[in-house]
Amino acid sequence: MTSSIRPLLAGNWKMNGTSESLRELRAIASGIDSDRDRCFEALVCVPATLLSRASDILSDENIFLGGQDCHFNDSGPHTGDISACMLKEAGASHVILGHSERRTDYRESDAIVCAKVKAAWRAGLVALICIGETLEERENNTVLDVLAQQLKGSVPAGAMDHNTVIAYEPRWAIGTGKTPTSEDIAQVHGFIRKEVSHRFGDEGHKIRLLYGGSVKPSNASELLETSHVNGALIGGASLKATDFLTICNIYRKL
């Protein structure tokens, strides 16, 4: 962790959850105290269908609400898409962009991610930008080159700590139960910090860097104590209040 940066624990529900799942969100909200938990911030990114109701649940809570993607246009003939403005109106303050599943399933390029980030900023949303290498790229020892290109292509000029969060999520670790070693994560996060600091100056020193990829209660302590890690992007473990709150409790003790 970087002690001067307030960490962020971000849950990503992905394409999971119905109205019944909001019970878990209520439990998460009940388990996070705004006075006690000033040592970190919490964010839950739910499916778009749940945003409005989730916003009602979290309206008086110390938890941020996020979307999972947005279009790069503010409106128009884009059937099935959702704009950043719509997310904002539904109660979101953040949006995940460039997630590995979007990059893989929909062939989203760095340029598309960059355009979406700009749309998020226009709407007043914080962009949580994901970058990460494939297993092949890791085996070919091109991880840092890949990440440098993704940072350059996906993060627009104007990134600041109040409008940008960057999550390192190695694609091969998403949903597999596998994670890099803490040494590998520290190396990568140190590299990312160097890159954003060089490009954005003082703001680059303050942008939060999250780790994402099979984060769960059993490995959270080791991951969150790793150098240059300012929080986590949590997938499956954010669907159950007990798991998410266990990770929050681990953070309280660090």
Curated annotation (Swiss-Prot):
Q: Name one Pfam family in it.
A: TIM
Q: Which PROSITE patterns match?
A: TIM_2 (PS51440)
Q: Which residues cross the membrane?
A: none
| Family membership noted in the UniProt record | Belongs to the triosephosphate isomerase family.
**Which residues of the sequence carry a binding annotation for substrate?**
12-14, 175, 214, 235-236
Q: What is its EC number?
A: 5.3.1.1
What pathway does the UniProt record associate with this protein?
A: Carbohydrate biosynthesis; gluconeogenesis; Carbohydrate degradation; glycolysis; D-glyceraldehyde 3-phosphate from glycerone phosphate: step 1/1
Which one of the record's GO molecular function terms can you name?
triose-phosphate isomerase activity
Please name the InterPro entries in this protein's record: Aldolase_TIM, TIM_sf, TrioseP_Isoase_bac/euk, Triosephosphate_isomerase
The entry's protein name is Triosephosphate isomerase
A biological process from GO:
gluconeogenesis
Top-rank EC class of the record's enzyme: isomerase
Q: What does this protein do?
A: Involved in the gluconeogenesis. Catalyzes stereospecifically the conversion of dihydroxyacetone phosphate (DHAP) to D-glyceraldehyde-3-phosphate (G3P).
Subunit and interaction comment: Homodimer.
- Sorted alphabetically, which HAMAP family does this protein's record hold? TIM_B
Q: Which gene encodes it?
A: tpiA
